[in-house]
Amino acid sequence: MEVQCQTSFCQNEDGFPKLLRTCTVRLGIRSQPDYDGREFVDHGTEKCVVTVYIGSSPHHVEWSVTAARHRFKDTCQVVARKALRTLCQIYEEE
């Protein structure tokens, strides 16, 4: 099984990655969301697992979220949306 690894800030991706970056900046998170993905073939099916790492802010520690789909570009959208949902829960009271 061949595994291809990819790390990206997804800076040029529209949609949820762009919205996630905008939200993290407004919440005082200085580091960019960092996407770490692995594409591989499992039993003849293309799969991709991406983890997005969100840096710490003045009031919260760093955290991460993982999602799985089929391609890196699509999985970045899914994991960014999942991170936005988590971000809303963490910062709900602020």
Predicted regions and their residues:
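N-terminal segment of the canonical double-stranded RNA-binding domain
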Residues: 1-62, 69-77, 81-94
